[in-house]
Amino acid sequence: MALKIRLARGGSKKRPYYQIVVADARSPRDGRFLEKIGSWNPMLSKDDEKRIELNAERVSHWIAQGAQPTDRVLRFLDQAGLAKRPARSNPTKAVPGKKAQERAAEAKQKAEDAAAAAAESAAE
């Protein structure tokens, strides 16, 4: 049985509240789970201590049993110091595309031409 540590949504419309649960990966998001190990209330301010609550002992137990945390839960565990999130390395993501590079080169060329024309007219 593939176990996941994931979020199960509760609360009402426009007022989300999430339980951090251990569940079989095949069960529905808000369906059957094995154990509730914490909660997350995104409606509280970011510095509120009750925003994220985790039972560290049970989290460690389930990770030792082979449960895989989802991306969002892994962020919470990393903040709490219970698990390490791998560093993301995608250096090509910030590089502009071909068209953007061509437009930047054209704009640079126009600026150089304008500066040269201004210097030429000032010299006369």
Swiss-Prot record:
Compositional bias segments (type: Basic and acidic residues): 99-113
GO biological process terms, semicolon-separated: translation
Annotated segments matching region Disordered: 82-124
GO CC annotations, alphabetized: cytoplasm; small ribosomal subunit
UniProt GO molecular function: structural constituent of ribosome
Gene3D superfamilies: 3.30.1320.10
InterPro entries: Ribosomal_bS16, Ribosomal_bS16_dom_sf
Keyword annotations of the record: Ribonucleoprotein, Ribosomal protein
Coiled coil regions in record: none
Biased composition, class Low complexity, residue ranges: 114-124
Family in the record: Belongs to the bacterial ribosomal protein bS16 family.
Record protein name field: Small ribosomal subunit protein bS16
Source species: Sinorhizobium fredii (strain NBRC 101917 / NGR234)
Lineage: Bacteria, Pseudomonadati, Pseudomonadota, Alphaproteobacteria, Hyphomicrobiales
Annotated gene: rpsP
